[in-house]
Amino acid sequence: MTLNRRDFIKTSGAAVAAVGILGFPHLAFGAGRKVVVVGGGTGGATAAKYIKLADPSIEVTLIEPNTDYYTCYLSNEVIGGDRKLESIKHGYDGLRAHGIQVVHDSATGIDPDKKLVKTAGGAEFGYDRCVVAPGIELIYDKIEGYSEEAAAKLPHAWKAGEQTAILRKQLEDMADGGTVVIAPPAAPFRCPPGPYERASQVAYYLKAHKPKSKVIILDSSQTFSKQSQFSKGWERLYGFGTENAMIEWHPGPDSAVVKVDGGEMMVETAFGDEFKADVINLIPPQRAGKIAQIAGLTNDAGWCPVDIKTFESSIHKGIHVIGDACIANPMPKSGYSANSQGKVAAAAVVALLKGEEPGTPSYLNTCYSILAPAYGISVAAIYRPNADGSAIESVPDSGGVTPVDAPDWVLEREVQYAYSWYNNIVHDTFG
């Protein structure tokens, strides 16, 4: 039976609330077991919380360098001007209230043999099981002329917070008639629909305040997530495909940005075309966060292979890798995927510490994109292990995508669903 959108929201909402749907065992009070979680983003915070909820006797330590976490999801609304940066900032007091030890330090090494996590501050944390949620590392040097230092002028804004604010200010400072270049990388990367939602939000701001301006997307890929839905929205809102289009899309490997000159504010594509811009939003290629590389958890492509039933590393036993860093195709690298994977890993960790076989999990994802205040679209899916447990597959006839010809009331409702989802997931993760 195909789920309609209302039923899917109900189903996924219930899954967020009900720990048992992800196979958690009943409460078990073990003796002095320790779990160290490295990384306090959506995946890591979720895993830490749900391990502690499932078995309060487990000593859970979360190691995260930042005292506040800014969600990438809904950060594009900050760039578009309809949301304040503070609204996507979240702290860790909620996790502390559950009895989790939160250590604000950077993990610098993991010894899988001695079962130790080392930090920049010189501390060592022993563990029985370790969960690594390192997020992504941006590979700046894949683009000639780009670097972490250059990102202060040529923001990626693919890690929310300061970078989000930089990009927003540049748009505010730009004169009417200016050009904004957005350059997404080739897949895989964090939040596949993100660059196109960003283009929409930038166009929304420019249409209202700087209507002579233009957004140019220089895309490494030929296709993108929710492409038909985005294209329809761009046509309706921003004149896409017309002579007066506010958004231009240049697809394919030849359009990939390979060189940037921050002084001249110029980018060059693989084909050799040059584009001068007033604002350059350059999103570089990505790989698993640095600690995953240091710990030897990555493959040659820079991502972390895992057992999809437990998210235990295929390289180092006793270490589970979740979120953007892990290989969990066809699940996208998204906040909701990280939350879902955090719960699956938590259930597996608790079971394994009891000497039990973890249950068979299911996984959820929904990605909302807001093109304008009353124009939202989404894609949703339920996933499960395949027959032999070697890979993740989509459950047939589950989830769905916003119809291309959806009426206005549906598009407006999607925005409200997005806000409700956001409030629920941040409470579920950090509350």
UniProtKB/Swiss-Prot annotation:
Description of how the protein assembles with itself and partners: Dimer of one cytochrome and one flavoprotein.
EC number(s) per entry: 1.8.2.3
Root EC class: oxidoreductase
Description of post-translational modifications: Predicted to be exported by the Tat system. The position of the signal peptide cleavage has been experimentally proven.
Signal peptide residue numbers: 1-30
One MF term in the entry's GO annotations: sulfide dehydrogenase activity
Cysteine pairs bridged by disulfides in the record: 191-367
Additional facts recorded: The active site is a redox-active disulfide bond.
Superkingdom as given in the UniProt entry: Bacteria
Main location: periplasm
Swiss-Prot/TrEMBL catalytic activity: hydrogen sulfide + 2 Fe(III)-[cytochrome c] = sulfur + 2 Fe(II)-[cytochrome c] + H(+)
Full protein name: Sulfide dehydrogenase [flavocytochrome c] flavoprotein chain
Subcellular location: Periplasm
Flavoprotein found in the keyword field: yes
UniProt KW Oxidoreductase keyword: yes
Protein encoded by which gene: fccB
Positions that bind FAD: 70-76
